[in-house]
Structure formats: C-alpha cells, structure tokens
C-alpha cells in the first residue's frame, strides 16, 4: 500500500509532457512530382507594362514543355511569393488553405515584373531567403533591372539597377564567356533595346556573359558609362542560390529568335541547378 501511494504522489508531481510541435499544413498533392518547377511572375501593377510580356510568358512555358526540363507556372500577381501557407478569401474559401503553392514548391522564379512592386516586407524577406538561404534560383528578364528600385537588397541580389536605355536598334555584342551554356554562338549584332546600369552594379560582383562592344558605341552612347562597361547578360551566386539576368526581350521578336530562346533556356537550366558553369566575378577571373 505504501509503495502504491508513493507511486501515485510521484505521478501527480511529474512535469507535463511537452506539447507536440505544431504541424505545418501540407500542400495539395503534387501532379509534377520529381520535376523542376519554375514560377513565372509578371507583376507589373506598379510599373511599365511591356507589350512583349504575354509572349515572353508563353515562350518560357513552351520551352519548358518542349524540352522537358521544367514545368512553368504563370502568374501576373505576386501572391505565391511567400513562405507562408496560402489561404483563401470570400464566403467559400475564407480561412481555408487552398491549392495555391507557396515558394516551398518551386525551384526557381523567373521575374518579368517592373516598378516598385506589390510585395510586403515579409514577402521581400521570403524572396531573398528563397535564393540566398534555400539555394534556389532567380532569373530576371528584360525589365527586372527596373523593378523594386526602392529595395536595395533586391538590387544587390540581381547585381544592379537600370540607369537608362538606348532606343531599339541593332548593336554590336561581345560574347564575354563563350563557355557559358548557350552563349558561344550568339550573333555579334542583334536588335533590341539595350540598357546601361547604375549602383549597386559593379563588374566585380557579377560574371558577364554578353556585353555591348564599347569600341562600336558612339561618343554619345559611351558617355552613359565612360568606363565602357555595358553588360547585357550576366550571372552570379547569391548566398547558396543562383541568379541569372538577361536584358533581352523588350519586343516580341527577340523571344522568337532561336539564339535568345537558347540563351534563356540555358540560363533557366543553370538557375535550376540542372547544369553548372563558372560564374566567378569578372575582376576575380582576370
């Protein structure tokens, strides 16, 4: 009897068992399990709406479907740029997790937006962590250098902001890194709208793949950057992740050119981790 009472007292004084950790809601079943997923975002609510955006999104989706390297998910809003579960709204779905995917589902983002953007501070933190900490990919299209211009950390991630642009015209290019997949056979003259960059751009922070040939620029054009540094396509590592920026695609036509499509496809593959390339920053590779 004494032993029984002592045992009861011990049981009454024992510390409660720790609470089980909260279980994060699971997303819907994955119909593309085992395949790379690319989130294509063209949120231009606060910026210039390039007429080529619809064609660009369709081309990116088509390249993934035809090559089999990735599945593209097309959005014209930024809702999915979050690490939080996505819940619905309205009478039917309010407070319920819906089948929209958050960043956990994707392997890279292809960003075609422009302007100051609609991201909340938490979404901005989630986007940076998606690349820097999670080791995912970020591909920026033509207008990505004029997006989020009041967000310094974004400019640091992509390598710089656009300072201005030349009118659409044929210009001469130098293939700076012919070993980067898709770059070797790019034509040395190509018609598009070319940009020139400003801070935080620094050639020591990026690996240039294609650039304008400064020897073929007019004095007026060269005055935009007297150092003659006019990158057109570049790549860089950002933390554990990969960033690939191409400024091609102001109009529809470049998206139909095999050389541009090949360059974008190979950039996507690299950002997804399907291929490797040396992206040592320019000043360190000399």
Placement of each model-derived feature along the sequence:
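Bacterial N-terminal signal peptides
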Residues: 1-7
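Extracellular ligand-binding/catalytic regions of CAZymes and related secreted enzymes
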Residues: 13-35, 54, 59-67, 76, ...
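Glycine-rich, highly charged phosphate/nucleotide-binding loops
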Residues: 20-21, 76-102
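Catalytic beta-strand/loop cores that center a nucleophilic Ser/Cys/Thr
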Residues: 20-24, 94, 160, 164-239
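Stable alpha-helical elements in mature extracytoplasmic
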Residues: 34, 52, 56-60, 102, ...
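Short beta-strand segments enriched in small/hydrophobic residues
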Residues: 35-47
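Short alpha-beta junction capping motif
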Residues: 38-41, 100-151, 240, 246
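Solvent-exposed loop/turn segments at secondary-structure junctions
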Residues: 44-48, 78-82, 110, 114-118, ...
């Amino acid at each position: 009897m004494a032993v029984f009472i002592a045992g009861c007292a011990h049981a009454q004084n024992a510390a409660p068992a720790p609470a089980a950790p909260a279980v994060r809601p699971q997303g819907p079943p994955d119909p593309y399990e085992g395949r790379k997923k690319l989130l294509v975002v063209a949120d231009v609510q606060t910026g210039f709406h390039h007429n080529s955006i619809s064609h660009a999104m369709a081309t990116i989706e088509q390249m993934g479907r035809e090559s089999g390297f990735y599945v593209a998910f097309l959005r014209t809003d930024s809702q999915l740029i979050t690490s939080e579960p996505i819940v619905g709204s309205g009478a039917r779905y309010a407070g319920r997790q819906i089948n929209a995917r958050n960043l956990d589902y994707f392997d890279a983002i292809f960003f075609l937006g422009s302007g100051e953007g609609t991201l909340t501070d938490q979404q901005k933190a989630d986007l940076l962590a998606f690349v820097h900490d999670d080791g995912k990919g970020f591909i920026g299209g033509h207008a990505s250098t004029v997006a989020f211009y009041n967000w310094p950390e974004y400019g640091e991630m992509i390598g710089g902001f656009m300072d201005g642009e030349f009118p659409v015209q044929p210009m001469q290019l130098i293939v700076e890194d012919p070993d980067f997949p898709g770059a070797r056979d790019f034509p040395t003259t190509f018609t598009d709208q070319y940009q020139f960059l400003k801070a935080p751009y620094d050639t020591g922070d990026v690996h240039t793949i294609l650039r304008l040939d400064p020897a073929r620029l007019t004095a007026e054009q060269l005055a935009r950057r007297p150092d003659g540094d006019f990158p057109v396509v570049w790549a860089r590592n950002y933390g554990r992740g990969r960033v690939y920026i191409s400024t091609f695609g102001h109009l529809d036509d470049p998206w139909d050119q095999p050389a541009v499509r090949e360059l974008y496809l190979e950039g996507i593959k690299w950002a997804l981790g399907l291929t490797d390339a040396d992206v040592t920053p320019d000043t360190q590779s000399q």
